[in-house]
Amino acid sequence: MIHFILLFSRQGKLRLQKWYITLPDKERKKITREIVQIILSRGHRTSSFVDWKELKLVYKRYASLYFCCAIENQDNELLTLEIVHRYVELLDKYFGNVCELDIIFNFEKAYFILDEFIIGGEIQETSKKIAVKAIEDSDMLQEVSTVSQTMGER
């Protein structure tokens, strides 16, 4: 099970976080700071897996963003890397070659895509087509709602 997912920049700025365990905010901030520091201090040629406390950290850098998942010790690291890659593929499919600015200015869409893909720390939808279709359907509903509200105001 995935305990949490963090997306952060090379400068250490947190761009997205999703927690699948309950922790107080103070503890989350402490953990986030510690993990960002650990990963950013590692060399580029080192392993993408880090034993951390009773969990394993699995991370991958895409352009200027690090995608990091904390998983249980018995979970498969390579499968987790594939989950990270699938999330990046979904972001790319939606945004068209996603970049850090897409995450910053459209964070709600990035969270929505993540929620379509992973729920409760487990993979919910493995099909990219189905996940992207759900996101596009949501966009269409939002657009229709906005148009009908605008028409109602006239």
Curated annotation (Swiss-Prot):
UniProt KW keywords: Coated pit, Cytoplasmic vesicle, Disease variant, Golgi apparatus, Membrane, Protein transport, Transport
Disulphide bridges, residue numbers: none
Main location: Golgi
Topology of the protein relative to the lipid bilayer: Peripheral membrane protein
Keyword Transmembrane helix: no
This protein's GO CC annotations: AP-1 adaptor complex; clathrin-coated pit; cytoplasmic vesicle membrane; cytosol; early endosome; Golgi membrane; intracellular membrane-bounded organelle; lysosomal membrane
Record-level GO BP terms: intracellular protein transport; melanosome assembly; platelet dense granule organization; protein targeting; vesicle-mediated transport
Quaternary structure and partners: Adaptor protein complex 1 (AP-1) is a heterotetramer composed of two large adaptins (gamma-type subunit AP1G1 and beta-type subunit AP1B1), a medium adaptin (mu-type subunit AP1M1 or AP1M2) and a small adaptin (sigma-type subunit AP1S1 or AP1S2 or AP1S3).
Disease the record associates with this protein: Psoriasis 15, pustular: A form of pustular psoriasis, a life-threatening disease defined by repeated flares of sudden onset consisting of diffuse erythematous skin eruption characterized by rapid coverage with pustules, high-grade fever, asthenia, marked leukocytosis, and elevated serum levels of C-reactive protein.
Protein name: AP-1 complex subunit sigma-3
